[in-house]
Amino acid sequence: MSRRKRPNWINTIALERMQILFEQAEKEFSKHPERSDRYVKLTRNISTKYNIPLPNYWRGRFCKNCNKFLKPGSNLRVRLSNNTISRKCLECGDLKKVPYTKKN
């Protein structure tokens, strides 16, 4: 017997909450970085509970290793080399490499 599917309005509310939490994390990062880290953790909890994937533009804004909110220049180092984007978290040292191609 399969599990019952959640109504669509629940997923809509969960996405709205996740968006609000990420916006708050961006606003609070300069004054209270620990608060923005908590918002990221809450967003990931909502995402896993309701089985909603995070949109691509949010996936690069936090470290998957230490759950910290990442802002380039303050706790994230971004390097471009050999068709890869290297993103290094300066909190835990985790390195993520993403391939890219140049557009003409």
Swiss-Prot record:
Q: Which EC number applies?
A: 3.1.26.5
The main location is cytoplasm
Summarize subunit and interaction data from the UniProt record for this chain. Answer: Consists of a catalytic RNA component and at least 4-5 protein subunits.
Domain of life of the native organism:
Archaea
Q: What does this protein do?
A: Part of ribonuclease P, a protein complex that generates mature tRNA molecules by cleaving their 5'-ends.
Q: Which gene encodes it?
A: rnp4
Which InterPro entries does the annotation name? Answer: RNP4, Rpr2/Snm1/Rpp21
| Reactions accelerated catalytically | Endonucleolytic cleavage of RNA, removing 5'-extranucleotides from tRNA precursor
Could you tell me where this protein is found in the cell? Cytoplasm
The UniProt family comment states: Belongs to the eukaryotic/archaeal RNase P protein component 4 family.
One record GO biological process? tRNA 5'-leader removal
Annotated keywords: Cytoplasm, Endonuclease, Hydrolase, Metal-binding, Nuclease, tRNA processing, Zinc
Read off the HAMAP family from this record.
RNase_P_4 (MF_00757)
The cofactor note from the UniProt entry for this protein is:
Binds 1 zinc ion per subunit.
Q: Which cofactor(s) are needed, names only?
A: Zn(2+)
Entry protein name? Ribonuclease P protein component 4
Q: Which residues bind Zn(2+)?
A: C63, C66, C89, C92
GO CC terms: cytoplasm; ribonuclease P complex
tRNA processing as a keyword of this entry, yes or no, is yes
**Gene Ontology molecular function, alphabetical:** ribonuclease P activity; zinc ion binding
Q: What class of enzyme is it?
A: hydrolase
